[in-house]
Regions:
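Feature 14080 marks short, conserved micro-sites in well-ordered regions
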Residues: 37, 43-509
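C-terminal motif of bacterial Sec signal peptides marking the signal peptidase cleavage site
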Residues: 15-17
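Bacterial N-terminal signal peptides that target proteins for export
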Residues: 1-8
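Bacterial signal peptide processing site
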Residues: 19-21
Length: 509
């Protein structure tokens, strides 16, 4: 993957109400005072899945006419609705379908099909409330609009033609706020060359699908958001002014500005990561400063934790216990350092410096590509991409950390070295993570790890002739589903069985 434009960040890190400096660059390689070794695997009870337990669920899509596996659009948008997997299928010929699966061929069926419209709009944004499944889909009469399903064909219908006629509606931020759906309608206004942002809610009926607030055309609503409890958190930036955090619970009274974060102008949120009741994010300022923030969705619980100046790039990893974890990467030395920042306030502390074998070979800046933490987990799994002066990376690596130097381990390298396909990282438990990796013998295939080097291995060689390019790992009950390109010459629905009864490791087939 090519260089991702990041915000420049600094040597100086300041905790709330106090100051503290990062170590000088020449000391980076010696920050870790204890060896970086494999962490102890926690007793989560889940075992490494097997190749035998990894099977194609159903052949849904015909052979691809595009014929480029990494571009194949297989089943996706996985969501749990009433205890059953639901997902979208978008065919190359323009047809669309809402599907469901119980994990068997016979139990994998189409709920509702949509004929091709020629618009290119996808069936997408599946969002479940306790009793209704909302999604966006196109038809010839209404364009791409909001639909709802109760899980049956008869109970799947258009909610409302939000933009009357065949013109598409551009809907974003679909989020369940209890039994209510909240979302934004974005409309480009050609008269002022800006976008109008409107916050809407829906109860699944046309009459109950109404606008909550018109934010107008003088602001920009970030594509980043967070779900906390039954509320949606989102960021609003005045085009010539401040950036603020907002929340909505689907009511007019519950749609409020939580806090004004920065006076601006040109301040943008990045790396929004939620763990339990806490969300971390960073603000990037035009001055080159970057700030680490935390929020629990209240004004009092929305606080700046640290500031970083313009000589380093910063990525947010997440929170473990009493600390937030970030990485800082020096633009001059090209070393990445993990820091922990007290959530209660205080100076950041270095944890460990990650190795970089390419610092003397020109452009080789590391950055975080993906992060995953199991619900309630005590470890962070993350992928590091080491860039180059071209579109493809020099290296890609899977790491795990429990917040200590000794518990920070390189599990696998390389992952994907393509600039057109990045490896997903999906932690099911502290001792089970799914990802994809490259091997000379198999290409890019699904892999698993229990958080140790010895417990990191190929799950299954799905496409014996090439790479299967797995996408969208998703746990539903005792299975993990994903999309993979296989011998049907298209990406199909696959799953692997989770187990609490461990067996001796097998050779992946």
């Amino acid at each position: 993957m090519g260089w991702r434009g990041g915000w420049v960040l600094s040597l100086l890190v300041v905790g709330v109400g106090c100051g503290g400096a990062l170590p000088e660059e020449q000391t980076e390689a010696g920050l870790a005072q204890e060896p970086t070794s494999a962490p102890e695997v926690t007793a989560e009870g889940l075992c490494l899945p097997t190749a035998a337990g990894t099977q194609r669920v159903k052949t849904i899509l015909p052979p691809s006419e595009i014929g480029i596996p990494r571009f194949a659009m297989g089943p996706g948008g996985f969501v749990d609705f009433k205890g059953t997997l639901h997902f979208a299928v978008n065919y190359e010929d323009g047809r669309r379908g809402l599907w469901r699966s119980t994990g068997t061929d016979a139990g994998t069926t189409q709920v509702k099909g949509f004929p091709a419209t020629g618009s290119g709009s996808l069936l997408s944004q599946l969002t479940a409330t306790p009793t209704q499944l909302f999604f966006q889909a196109p038809d010839a009469a209404h364009g791409s609009e909001l639909w709802v399903s109760d899980g049956t064909t008869a109970g799947t219908r258009l909610v409302k033609d939000v933009t009357p006629g065949p013109e598409d509606s551009y809907l974003t931020h679909l989020t369940a706020a209890g039994s209510t759906l909240v979302f934004f309608k974005e409309t480009y206004d050609a008269t002022v060359f800006t976008t109008r942002y409107e916050l809407w809610k829906s109860d699944g009926t046309a009459a109950g699908t109404v606008r909550l607030r018109d934010f107008g055309t003088s602001v920009d609503v970030s594509y980043l958001d967070a779900k906390q409890g039954n509320a949606l958190l989102f960021f609003v930036r005045e085009l010539e002014g401040a950036t603020s955090l907002w929340r909505t619970d689907g009511t007019a009274a519950g749609t409020v500005q939580v806090k004004r974060l920065d006076a601006g102008p040109d301040t943008y949120p990045n790396d929004v990561r939620t763990s339990g009741a806490l969300t971390l994010f960073r603000l990037s300022e035009s001055s080159g400063l970057t700030e680490l923030w935390k929020t629990d969705g209240t004004a009092g619980g929305t606080l700046r934790l640290a500031s970083f100046g313009p000589t380093r790039a910063v990525d947010v990893l997440g929170s473990l216990g009493a600390y937030a974890y970030v990485t800082t990467t020096s633009y001059s030395t090209q070393y990445m350092v993990i820091y922990r920042v007290p959530l209660a306030g205080g100076n950041p502390e270095p944890v460990v410096t990650l190795p970089n074998d390419y610092t003397s070979q020109g452009d080789a800046l590391p950055f975080i590509n993906a992060v995953s933490q199991a619900p309630g987990g005590t470890k962070l799994y993350f992928s590091v991409t080491i860039g180059s002066n071209g579109p493809a990376p020099r290296d890609t690596q899977l790491w795990v950390t429990n917040g200590t130097a000794g518990g920070t381990t390189l599990l696998r390298r390389p992952l994907s070295l393509s600039d057109e396909y990045g490896s997903p990282v999906y932690a099911v438990a502290d001792n089970l993570v799914f990802f994809s990796a490259y091997d000379d013998a198999t290409g890019i295939e699904p892999w698993v790890s229990n958080g140790t080097v010895a417990g990191t291995r190929l799950l299954k060689n799905i496409d014996a002739q090439a790479s299967s390019y797995p996408h969208e790992f998703f746990r539903q009950g005792n299975r993990v589903y994903f999309s993979a390109y296989d011998d049907t010459l298209n990406a199909q629905l696959w799953s692997t069985q989770l187990s609490h009864a461990c067996v001796a490791p097998e050779d992946a087939q």
